[in-house]
């Protein structure tokens, strides 16, 4: 019996181990809900007591006091705080850097120019700004010179562009109409140019044609009717007048048949 109990006890242990390996979906949901419901317990910060001594939370009931020089207890849970991102899109860094560099250059150059232009006092002492009227110097003139000073404020004279005159091309009107060779020769002869068939002989100018001349302008009324030639073996047509037809008498035109022998040679052979 003891052996059977041990055997079943081992089986129960194996079953319990197998059950713990697999977790159902319901159990996972419950664990997640329990985790979200748990409140984060923050440790209390040490309170500073009178006399400059800090008291830790666990040691408050016991009354033990921890000196301030002791290292602070690290908190187990730290709250995550998102840093607010600043918008630097409108910041002009390049412009600020150029302005600062330009100001430093102007200040340096102005100090150098001022040191070079400060005249010595007549008594051999240092120059004083109060003596400007007596010496004839004015800060306004110096400031005007400083304004135009510097490579970024130099006015570059505009280069004069030489305008090259463009030759105007005269369009040649070429006539696209066809001119016969005879007319070309006549035009060349009229203009005094040679090369015609007559060797450049002068010809009379073109005159208006005579419209009444029937030789150049024939008309239909002046045309003579020509008799049409009849072709051979062409059938004749009957002429119709007053709606009646001429009835021609049919005459027998057939030649009489000769039954007698017209050739005497046959008679000679028969005899």
Curated annotation (Swiss-Prot):
Positions where Phosphoserine occurs in the chain: 134
Highest taxon in the source lineage: Eukaryota
Comp. bias intervals (Low complexity): 48-61
A single Gene Ontology CC term: cytoplasm
Keywords: Phosphoprotein
Bias type Basic and acidic residues, positions: 37-47, 224-242
Compositionally biased intervals (Acidic residues): 73-82
Region (Disordered): 37-151, 186-271
Keyword Transmembrane recorded: no
Database matches in Pfam families: CDV3
Compositional bias ranges of the Polar residues kind: 95-114
Stretches that traverse the bilayer: none
Family under the similarity heading: Belongs to the CDV3 family.
Protein name in the entry: Protein CDV3 homolog
Organism for this UniProt entry: Drosophila melanogaster
Lineage summary: Eukaryota, Metazoa, Ecdysozoa, Arthropoda, Hexapoda
